[in-house]
Amino acid sequence: MPQTISCAIVVYNEERNVRDCLESAKWMDEIIVVDAFSQDKTVQICREYTPRIYQRPWNGFGEQKNYAIDHAACDWVFILDADERISPELRAEIEAVLARSQTDGPVAYYLPRRNYFYGRWIKRLGCYPDYQLRLFRKGVGRLNDEEPHNKFVFQGEAGHLRTPLDHYTERTIEDHFRKFNNFTTLAAQERAKTRRTAHWYDLTFRPILTFFKYYLQRQGFREGMHGFVISVFASMYTFVKYAKLWDLIRAQNDGLDPPPV
């Protein structure tokens, strides 16, 4: 008998993305949505697909997702972001895993992810296969608190699926800047836990090296203008992350409140 599966989704102001996300996951046995008091129509859209909607203040990606996992009632859990989609082919592969229902096999599965920037699947720049651990047995582990890219920490054997998860990340430059600002703040706060200063070379050489790493070493030049723009953003991300780290430490040393997320 196939085992059951819960889909865990964390949202905040995702009315543009969440319907397509939910459509791709509605075949699962239940959908758990954790919303951080969205100001748009996100919750209204989610109610069309599931009654299992929980609202709580934003406490970081890891804590929000762990909260969703804790409320899942099925044998397996699949973590899905609002800008991601499960294709029919991926659904079939997931259902095959559930149908096997083995107790001594993998307890978690990595799957490749196709990242779409500005409407195009980017195959280079380290964007593919971009393996993500998203499918796991309930109770085998939890996400850590390393923001903004939390890791799932678990005990047991891991397997790999072949079919990719589709990730429609930055659709426009404006989208990229919006996420960029939030993620650089989270990255600076995470770095501040173990580092007490940012040096001048962090703001000069590191961004330059990052650009060449993405554009040349990771062959961003083969992705045309898409690759150039992504490489520039990667360089800017490095600069802003360390600039915010400097600003955060400066504020702490001066007894000021930390910058808001």
Residue ranges and their predicted role:
Residues 43-71, 100:
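Conserved donor nucleotide-binding strand/loop of the catalytic core
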Residues 9-27:
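Short, well-formed alpha-helical segments that are part of the catalytic scaffolds
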